[in-house]
Regions:
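PP2C/PPM-type serine/threonine phosphatase catalytic domain
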Residues: 1-270
Length: 270
């Protein structure tokens, strides 16, 4: 069983009580309130000996109790990780079941609060084990795989503008400033019995690869070149580089910046 330590009201780091991860990795997280009254994002990194789980959850500020939705989803998925033997036998099924359970618990939260309450959240999650990464997302929280200075992979948002992009009606550059950028098509805690979720297959990791999970408060205010420079900057700790990246995103959208959160992992070797 793992132990979790809360290092901020919305950030968690968890590990086995008497073991250090055998994986050669460097991890970091950041969560900034931006120019909002409350930080409704939640971030967690859970490190077992043979597997690591990264989580970034964005409580939807336009809905009641977004912070509680994010907290509920995070604790549910952390519990699923610690209750599953590592390395996880079927990563894709694990991610599907964990997200489904998180959705169920957020729906239950809304029912317990009041008939009118509909707490919701978007989510990005990544499991790292056996020299590979498996990820999943719901909504517009993203996962990036960065190699050297390039974006090798990124998740595709469940959002209206992503549909427009896929259909060729707008360009990638137009996504960031589009007036409907914040309209998500699905989320944890929504009306569907099970939200649409995208679950990746196995992504092989090479030394130096960086996995970045982030809320829209970060990616919407940075360019791919910014993320590439972040991945390539190995002269200082990943923690410092990620903090700098978060601050840059907040400054880029001041004085209207959103909550801005991310978790990152640099793969060194098995």
């Amino acid at each position: 069983m793992g132990v979790a330590a809360k290092i901020g009201h919305n950030r968690w780091i968890a590990s086995l009580a008497d073991e250090e991860p055998a994986l050669q990795i460097e991890t970091a997280d950041v969560s900034l309130i931006g120019h909002r009254e409350e930080n409704q994002d939640r971030v967690a990194i859970a490190a077992a000996e043979q597997a690591v789980l990264l989580l970034v959850i964005d409580g939807m500020g336009g809905h009641a109790d977004g912070a509680r939705a994010a907290e509920t989803a995070l604790s549910t998925m952390l519990e699923a990780f610690w209750q599953t033997p590592h390395p996880i036998f079927d990563p894709m099924t694990f991610l599907h079941l964990a997200l489904g359970k998180a959705h169920e618990e957020v729906v239950k939260l809304g029912s317990a609060l009041s008939p009118e309450a509909r707490p919701r959240a978007t989510c990005a999650v990544c499991l790292v084990q056996d020299s590979a990464a498996y990820w999943a997302h719901v909504g517009d929280s993203r996962v990036y795989q960065l190699r050297q200075s390039q974006v090798l992979e990124r998740t595709r948002d469940h959002s209206h503008v992503e549909v427009l992009l896929r259909e060729g009606l707008i360009t990638e550059a137009e996504v960031h400033g589009h007036p409907m950028r914040n309209y998500v098509e699905c989320c944890l805690g929504g009306d569907a019995a099970l939200p649409e979720m995208t679950i990746s297959s196995r992504h092989k990791l090479k030394a130096g690869d960086v996995l970045l999970l982030c809320t829209d408060g970060l990616w919407a205010n940075l360019k791919d070149q910014d993320l590439g420079r972040f991945a390539q900057s190995q002269a200082k700790p990943l923690r410092d580089s990620l903090n700098d990246l978060g601050k840059r995103a907040v400054e880029a959208s001041a004085p209207y910046s959103d909550n801005t959160s991310a978790a990152a992992l640099r793969w060194k070797a098995a």
